[in-house]
Regions:
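Charged, terminal alpha-helix-loop-beta segments
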Residues: 1-125
Length: 125
């Protein structure tokens, strides 16, 4: 996974217990440039609006438990297999926390793009 400048890894599957409820953050970073904690939630399938509710809860807990004076509010990213951009933007309108949704390509798909196809390999043999 490649990130932009300023990211420092803080942990994966980071556990927080808030008011008797368990929260498990998939990936936690701190961005020195943004001066913010950054949560990345990894999802195997397509985007679902419920992911934003989960992410909003994580951001609230992080801002209460981890954020220190001088830091900006925590930022959240849902990383899922695919998402309808128009639908994501529509759903995000009512959220006030800094959140976004991004998509990924699985390693297998990426490898298929990079490797020669079966016919090209046969020609080489």
């Amino acid at each position: 996974m490649t990130f932009g400048r300023g990211f420092s890894y803080m942990g994966n599957q980071v556990h927080y217990d808030k008011l008797g409820h368990d929260h498990w953050v998939d990936l936690l970073f701190f961005n020195r440039i943004l001066k913010s904690l950054v949560v990345i939630e990894l999802k195997k399938g397509s985007f679902k609006p419920a992911y934003l509710g989960q992410l909003a809860a994580y951001l609230r807990v992080l801002d209460d438990e981890e954020r220190i004076e001088g830091e900006n509010p925590s930022v959240g990213i849902v990383l899922c297999k695919d998402a309808d951009r128009a639908y994501v933007e529509y759903v995000l309108q009512d959220y006030t926390k800094p959140m976004g949704v991004a998509t990924y390509k699985s390693s297998q798909e990426r490898l298929r793009e990079l490797l020669p196809d079966e016919e090209e390999i046969k020609k080489l043999l």
